[in-house]
Amino acid sequence: MQEVKKKKRKFWIIFGSVFLSLVVCFLTIGQIGAFSTAKTLHFWRPNYAKVDIAPLLEKTELTEDDYQLLYRQTGVTKLGIDDMREDEAGKKRILEIQNCLFADYSTYKDCFGLFTYTEELGKKGAEQYSKLARLRTGDVLVSTSMLVSWWRLGHSALVIDGDAGHILEAVQAGWVSEISSVTTFNTRANFILLRPKVDVEMKMQVADYAKKNLVGLRYDLTVGVLSKKYKKEQKKSHCGHIVWRAYKEFGIDIDSNGGGIVTPEDMYYSEYMEVVQVFGLDLNLDKLW
């Protein structure tokens, strides 16, 4: 009997030691990954001169060279420029966007979870803000600024009310998906504003569905791997999945590679997406991600 007890005690001691070693190993590797990835800051400022673009905005018609210059000066594509330069308020916004692109921002990393960081503008408690192009309901925002250990996962959100600046997003473990202000992207070190190539009526339906059915979902990054990617009654989601799920309800698959986990990067490369604006990422590159 004593021999059996000794064997059991020995087993649990060995098991506990191995388990503790694995936990320490996991935490160490995870933290090393977080420190390593945190050094690769994704924030870019133009390495060329700022020029006066106001005269261009007054032209009746713009050439391709004009649009290219405006893109390099603002990060806004033809799609976004044409959407804003129709009125004086839009022209003013374009000039404000240019000022933000060339502004001398400071940046910091905010740790908000286990091995999880975001890259932000300004300082903790004294954030700085960039300027977004005119939002349209159904737009998608993506950013490379969110890191999980070795993985630059990024973040994304669905614009559910362009005029009000309201977005639907799933932020982190322990939280549920919620409607928030788009200003959460204004403080990120970078973002890309995408516009799905579907008609306005469809995008309004997508936004309405999202508001009624995708708010309050528990955050779970394993959706699509440990559980089905598409469920009629969705209970769990994450930042990329929740945007994908809203469009998928109407037969539009914005996941470019069809994998289990839908990432912001997958949506950036979707054939359905057009770029409206880029901030904080190198405008000299054809592929921003």
Model-based region annotation:
Residues 115, 131-132, 182-185, 216-221:
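Short amphipathic alpha-helical segments, especially helix-boundary/capping motifs
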Residues 2-18, 23-114, 233-289:
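Activation targets extended, charge/polar-rich intrinsically disordered C-terminal tails
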Residues 191-193, 201, 277-279:
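Short, intrinsically disordered/low-complexity patches at protein termini
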Residues 135-197, 224-231:
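Glycine-rich catalytic cores of cysteine/serine-nucleophile enzymes that process amide/ester linkages
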Residues 63, 77-80, 131, 175-184, ...:
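Short, solvent-exposed coil/turn linker segments
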Residues 106-150:
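Short N-terminal edge-element motif at the start of the domain
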Residues 194-257:
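Active-site nucleophile-His-acid catalytic modules used for acyl/amide transfer and hydrolysis
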